[in-house]
């Protein structure tokens, strides 16, 4: 499929669109499910008075929740996929808004349930299981609802905190408005001598320029307004951190990190192991950066030189037809069952391929328990799009395995686990491409693509995670979070990670433009996810049939166990350091291969 001017939705060939008729043959099915959900909302709300009467009543309510949730989830997915395929279609936007409004109503009607389960004593909780053995099918779900026991205040106190939630979100909202709407950048001069206004959107183009003067000007121009507003950004970030620490304190946690990780049942050892091993392996990052410097022929490397491609443009391209066939072939190491799911994805038209006018940008995998796991793409004949395709196929296969193994209540998976399956696929594709494209330039490009992803995901996100924890600890210990103290903390960590790079003064204020620091200990999961995926893909490619079966069992597990326990069964104990060392072994091997090719 060639890259052409985007088509109108009705002009896209049917074979390049997803088949939503597999959900509902027409909107009539959507309307029927929506009406059913609305009819059940009063019963869901009224069950507050009866559901906890005894074990049988609780089981009946949980089964009702499953049925209603399945219907609203299906209706919502159908409507949001239709809305995303053409955002200019008002009828589909209205459909999506109606489904979302109904979902909010349903969520409100069932909101009483989790606090009610949480309020039970351990004895009362276990009594329900004695009365009704059928509740064992829901035990993990119910126990997960109780993980905050001991960390919940009285109803009156929680209600008071809830009313203050908008206040606690104020710093993040202010940052987003500043960063996305109010910040304006000066013009820069391009390689062609043209004056253009710098934006957050086009910055990546100019920071990758082959002209160092363009890179330097883009870098300095980007940071100028952030430095001008450094006290304001220090105030928003400091207030955000104080909010996290306050919430943790009043809810009886030792720290904000403990509170944030507890909600996903992730032990703090996972975080510490990541930071420890990445720090131990920083010499590998320094080696990769030295290779970049040598390839660019620079006497010294600045922060604005780190994003220049060192292997040129991609020497290989795939159109969609080629990529679809190659993806099925590339993922064969995942076994016959996985292979059949890949063929099914194409045969049953799970994938909406072509870019069209009004289509949502980017790519994703989305589905409900009772639907196929659909994939949205905006295809261009570029190698990066091939990686996006196998990435999203990884999410969809994960969803398919989970939903075809687990009951509704365990039929999805946590954010902590989500990126592992998709990144595993990317790593397996890298191995396939290295075997298929053996000429020197292709090998260099594929290897550097992998190393750059590893650097951006594991090294950089761990750097962010280390800084995020540092400023939370500073505040908890009573140290003021001023622009000076924040910049000092950031620059010290950055200098450690990029020890062989000139520390341009602007980089001390990089923290001011990073939205992840307002996401409360979220960013580390990018790094743990890729590290686990790297270790797992290596086991799949070079291990035993038992290694593959353990991986497939992770795909099947859903929410049937805590995320850390699911990964242990897959062969990766994320509370220990072994999987991280395995991942860095792969990185070092790939780095040595690229070093050898670049020195020829």
Language-model-detected regions and their locations in the chain:
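C-terminal, non-catalytic "cap/extension" segments appended to globular domains
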Residues: 10-12, 25, 113, 117, ...
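Long, K/E/R/D-enriched contiguous segments that form extended
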Residues: 295-333, 339, 350, 374, ...
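Short pre-active-site segment immediately N-terminal to the catalytic Zn-binding motif
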Residues: 316-320, 368-390
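Conserved helix-loop functional segments at active or binding sites
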Residues: 329, 333-340, 363-366, 395, ...
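Catalytic zinc-binding patch centered on the HExxH motif and its immediate surroundings
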Residues: 313-318, 351-371
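Post-HEXXH active-site segment of zinc metalloproteases
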Residues: 387, 399-423
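A well-structured
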Residues: 1-312, 596-600
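Short beta-alpha connecting loops at secondary-structure transitions
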Residues: 374-378, 405-415, 444-453, 472-474, ...
